[in-house]
């Protein structure tokens, strides 16, 4: 287990998962139509944790594919929502699945790419910003390989003064987004908003006084 894997496993084992939200992300509800995903289309949720957003997408009629490093997160997800799953193990990857939900427990960088059928869209609420800068180019490349031509990514990022605090979540600039997805046909900024300070906000509690949130829709050519 490398340093990054140990870090995330430790957070889940100790229950330090303030990044997990109990409500469906309002930006997903507001902007899911921007993806133009066909009915019953396949949506990838990388680094999915136990996000309730996945259940919401399934209820909208989509087939959801989740990839998560920590098995505890997936087990909590299926238990908390009383989902009856089938199980499978392929190499180092473990699979929990139903007819419209396919959850992989593995390191996304080590997953045999052939195991993931091409997807119509990707929903990234907190995956890119969970990765240090040196890993983000490889992550983007992996996701784009799984995305069908013409498919879209709904991506949430944030910016703050990272000289004061090291992530995760990491600050990702608009310039990095433009560079990372320059091969795509379209990069559209759907939302830019200064975050309102809340008592349980991790970054504000660490002394960051200003955080800006962004929502992007990126279309592959």
Curated annotation (Swiss-Prot):
BP GO terms, sorted: methylation; response to metal ion
GO MF annotations in UniProt: thiopurine S-methyltransferase activity
Localisation per UniProt entry: Cytoplasm
Cellular component, GO annotation: cytoplasm
EC code: 2.1.1.67
SUPFAM superfamilies: S-adenosyl-L-methionine-dependent methyltransferases
Primary residence: cytoplasm
Key words, A-Z: Cytoplasm, Methyltransferase, S-adenosyl-L-methionine, Transferase
Pfam families: TPMT
Binding site for S-adenosyl-L-methionine: 12, 47, 68, 125
Enzyme class: transferase
Transferase in keyword set: yes
Cleaved signal peptide residues: none
Record InterPro entries: SAM-dependent_MTases_sf, Thiopur_S-MeTfrase_Se/Te_detox, Thiopurine_S-MeTrfase, TPMT
Catalytic activity: S-adenosyl-L-methionine + a thiopurine = S-adenosyl-L-homocysteine + a thiopurine S-methylether
Xref: NCBIfam families: PRK13255.1, TMPT_Se_Te
Similarity section: Belongs to the class I-like SAM-binding methyltransferase superfamily. TPMT family.
Name the record gives this protein: Thiopurine S-methyltransferase
